[in-house]
Amino acid sequence: MDLPGPIHEILMLFGGFVLLLGGLGVVLLTNPIYSAFSLGLVLVCISLFYFLLNSYFVAVAQLLIYVGAINVLIIFAVMFVNGSEWSKDKNYWTIGDGFTSLVCITIVFSLMTTIPDTSWYGILWTTRSNQIVEQGLINNVQQIGIHLATDFYLPFELISIILLVSLIGAITMARQ
C-alpha cells in the first residue's frame, strides 16, 4: 500500500505488537481453542505485513490458505479432541518443553544475528525474469510462477514452513 510514512510505521508497529501478543497467546493459553484463535490472529497479522509490503498476491494467499483453510482445520481438530483431557493434565512443563524452548530461542537469536549481516543482493536474481515479464511473452499464470520463484521466493518458503509446522501440530494433536 502506498501510505504516508507515519501511517505506514504505525500500522507496522501495531501489526508487530498484535503479532507478538497473538504468538504469546498461542504458546501460553491453556485452552486449545483460544490458542487456535490466537494462531488465526497471528496469520492475519502476517497477511497485514504482506499487504504493507505491497505483496498483495502473497497476502491474499496467506489469508485464503492459512487463515481460511489451515486454521479452520486446526480449530476443527481441536474441537474434536476430548476437552477433559486438557483439564486433567497438571504437568505444564516437561523436559521436552524445555528442550523445545531452548531450540526455539537458539534459532531466534541465530536469525537475529544472521539476517542483518546477510547480503540479500545475491538472493534476488530477478533481472532475467523481469526482462521476460516486461516483454509480455508469457501469460498471467506464468508471471505468477516467475514472481513466486524470484521476487517472493523467501516469503513463499517461509509460508511453506509455517504450513509444515501447523500440519505436524495437527497430526500430533489428533494422535493424542
From Swiss-Prot:
The lineage of its organism: Eukaryota, Viridiplantae, Streptophyta, Embryophyta, Tracheophyta. This is NAD(P)H-quinone oxidoreductase subunit 6, chloroplastic. It comes from the Eukaryota. It catalyses: a plastoquinone + NADH + (n+1) H(+)(in) = a plastoquinol + NAD(+) + n H(+)(out); a plastoquinone + NADPH + (n+1) H(+)(in) = a plastoquinol + NADP(+) + n H(+)(out). NDH is composed of at least 16 different subunits, 5 of which are encoded in the nucleus. It is a multi-pass membrane protein. GO terms for molecular function: NADH dehydrogenase (ubiquinone) activity; quinone binding. Its EC number is 7.1.1.-. The gene is ndhG. PANTHER family: NAD(P)H-QUINONE OXIDOREDUCTASE SUBUNIT 6, CHLOROPLASTIC. The keyword Plastid applies. Keywords: Chloroplast, Membrane, NAD, NADP, Plastid, Plastoquinone, Quinone, Thylakoid, Translocase, Transmembrane, Transmembrane helix, Transport. Belongs to the complex I subunit 6 family. InterPro entries: NAD(P)H-Q_Oxidoreduct_6, NADH_UbQ/plastoQ_OxRdtase_su6, Nuo/plastoQ_OxRdtase_6_NuoJ. Signal peptide: none annotated. It is an enzyme of class 7 (translocase). The keyword Transport applies. It is found in: Plastid, Chloroplast thylakoid membrane. NDH shuttles electrons from NAD(P)H:plastoquinone, via FMN and iron-sulfur (Fe-S) centers, to quinones in the photosynthetic chain and possibly in a chloroplast respiratory chain. The immediate electron acceptor for the enzyme in this species is believed to be plastoquinone. Couples the redox reaction to proton translocation, and thus conserves the redox energy in a proton gradient. It comes from Triticum aestivum. The chain crosses the membrane at residues 10-30, 33-53, 60-80, 95-115, 152-172. GO terms for cellular component: chloroplast thylakoid membrane.
